[in-house]
Amino acid sequence: MNLNPYLDVAPEVAAAVAAGKPVVALESTIISHGMPYPQNVETALKVEQIIRDNGAVPATIAILGGRLKAGLTAEEIEYLGKKGQDVTKASRRDLAVLVSRKADGATTVTTTMMIAHMAGSQVFATGGIGGVHRGAETTMDISADLEELASTPVMVVCAGAKSILDLGLTLEYLETHGVPVLGYGTKELPAFYTRKSGFEVDYRVDTPAELAAAFRASLDLGLRGGMLVTNPIPEEFAMDHEVINRAIDEAVAQANAQGIHGKATTPFLLAKVKELTGGDSLDSNIQLVFNNARLAAQTAAELCRLG
């Protein structure tokens, strides 16, 4: 565990790490920017319960009053949920200023990986990672999540990159930076709301024990960076490929027309897709997060068995 002077590790999380028990990190941007209140709080608490039910300790991560928090109370989750998009969406570039100002921040995949690593958690469950945005060849809009995956040794369990992105370029970027992309029970990259994307992952892996063994080998080899596990949304909650792609294309067109860019892009696109699908995309989003939390907890437990 990193004895960072700005880090507060919840007692339950600290005890689990010290005892070599499984811990699963969770981000907080999904609470503040990913869903409306009260669904955001209900979802966050349910995700924590799923992790407990599968033998691990949840560590929801955020920045509160300038403190890096690894493990939140239910009251702190409620606070973030109610504050919603008034909370700064905090990536790596924001950390120092937020800490110095004693401000609040909701952690992205990037900052969740950083703080999880400081706190001693090796596995992190999220919905989908950021990536290379459509049109990035001219805008250079590439999520910091990809750089963090290349440099921080944390396993990230997700449902693929968010399908609002350019998935092909995202995979190319990860390959360039040496980040292994594994498919859980699939050789095809899942595309967040749907199980298929038309792109292949590097390797198919079929059990949590296999995932844990691969990550343990990565750590033992001293390889820099993390590992991306892509876990397809359960069939019964997957959206129709054509319906979601139409909604995404329309949302991207509206974002371009309104000049939306930078950190505002993803929340805008997710909200617009939700509106265009009559709320179906939010339901799918919630279910895929539950599914990823389950797999992350099972994998974290297997990782602990390996010592």
Residue ranges and their predicted role:
Residues 15-18, 23-24, 53, 115-118, ...:
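Solvent-exposed alpha-helices and their adjacent loops that cap or buttress functional pockets
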Residues 28, 33-35, 41-98, 220-236:
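Glycine-rich nucleotide/cofactor/substrate-binding loop typically near the N-terminus or early
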Residues 195-220:
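Anionic-ligand binding region
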